Amino acid sequence: MNILDQLAEYSRLRVAEDKKKISLEEMKNIAIQTKNEKLCDFAFEKALKKDDLSFICECKKASPSKGLIEPDFRYLEIAREYEAAGADCISVLTEPKWFLGSDEYLKEIAKMVSIPCIRKDFTVDEYQIYQAKTLGAAAVLLICSILSEVQLGEYIKICDSLGISALVEIHNEKEAGMAVRAGARIIGVNNRNLKDFTVDTANSRKLRDLIHDDIIFVSESGVKSTDDIRAIREIGADAVLIGETLMRADDKKAKLDELRLS
């Protein structure tokens, strides 16, 4: 079982435990009644629809490939730095075992900042989408590798009903077709293969032509330099998601400024 399969399986266990505390129907009702006073519906995708490249900046304490990244995880301070530096959106890891994430991180960050947040987790059940809405998320991550096409289509519809966005993650040509058929409006190419952790930034270039221009295109992972940003701009990407590079920067605002202005 590769790491992605392990992450998905652990998500199923987490959901089963969460349902013992709050049932699916209860969570649905809470989500439907949850209103975001600061953001409009579909604020995440609206933030990515601009003439220039949009930046999704990630808050994460650890990862399976790199281990502990930020021992002193000042997540609120980091989110504040990102917003001050001009980030368009913030990605918050909530997966607790391998990424040392927490729902509370998302809840507190979403409450503090005025830009949209995406819940970065391994969605395997509709429960997690309703849960994300209650935590203040403006978007959720849906990974094609761990979902069927039917599930993907259903989950996108649930997101639509809640006024939140779905970032649909793909890794290859087959998943690109799956995402388009399911009705994805935002498609992200993960340049990191979560099955073996190899990184290939050319993956975004390879898959770009398979995605219609009316779909928001996001390049995820492996972005380290201004050269990487220039390459992403050249293929006509709408947005880039940056995690480890910013998390390891001593001055996150300066690093983001450098990348944004490249």
What positions do the PLM features span?
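An N-cap/entry alpha-helix motif that binds or orients negatively charged groups
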Residues: 2-70
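N-terminal active-site wall of soluble small-molecule enzyme domains
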Residues: 59, 66-167, 173-179, 204-207
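Catalytic cores of alpha/beta
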Residues: 124-135, 173-182, 219, 223-242
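Glycine-rich phosphate-binding active-site loops on the catalytic face of alpha/beta enzymes
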Residues: 131-150, 188-197, 235-255
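C-terminal helical cap(s) of enzyme catalytic domains, especially alpha/beta-barrels
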Residues: 206-210, 233, 248-262
